[in-house]
């Protein structure tokens, strides 16, 4: 279950995880981005998401298919969705100019990834999937939090529910 919010303090994740019917909860930072690519007059729309600070399994995790994970201490390293990278001829080592929250940044692709969330992806407002027209990138949590003014906060919670959960009750409690 995804629960977008404008901004919430990170400590609320523990409160969400303790709700009846919730088996796990994580917070992340999500933001819209514009990706400038050579040869294109207009930037491509995209979505930037935080990676957790921890190693190992996490909710809605990414599968690294090429390269390596971004170094959490290096704010200009990103993972790129493999289908977008393939459609645009991008690979680890390439650089992207990305506008995030009104600021242009030069980012280095260090890996390509897949995610269950983005098996079939359409840009907001679109009906048909086009891998070349919507990019997804992942960054270390501190880097993306700084880019979107979300230090110490999250703007989307991800929850998994146990078998006994009543969806309507969980939704009411999350609200």
Residue ranges of predicted features:
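Membrane transport/envelope proteins' first extracytoplasmic loop
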Residues: 1-175
């Amino acid at each position: 279950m995804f629960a977008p919010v404008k901004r919430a303090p990170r400590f609320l994740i523990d409160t969400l995880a303790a709700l009846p019917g919730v088996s796990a909860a994580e917070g992340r930072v999500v933001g819209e981005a514009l990706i400038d690519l050579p040869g294109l007059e207009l930037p491509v729309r995209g979505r930037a998401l935080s990676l957790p600070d921890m190693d190992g399994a996490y909710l809605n995790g990414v599968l690294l298919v090429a390269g390596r994970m971004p170094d959490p201490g290096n704010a200009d390293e990103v993972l790129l969705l493999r289908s977008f990278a393939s459609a645009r001829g991008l690979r680890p080592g390439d650089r992207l100019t990305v506008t995030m929250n009104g600021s242009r940044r030069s980012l280095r692709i260090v890996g390509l990834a897949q995610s269950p969330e983005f098996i079939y992806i359409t840009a907001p407002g679109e009906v048909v999937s086009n891998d070349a027209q919507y990019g997804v990138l992942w960054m270390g949590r501190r880097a993306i939090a700084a880019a979107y003014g979300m230090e110490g906060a999250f703007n989307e919670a991800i929850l998994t529910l146990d078998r006994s959960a009543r969806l309507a009750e969980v939704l009411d409690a999350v609200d």
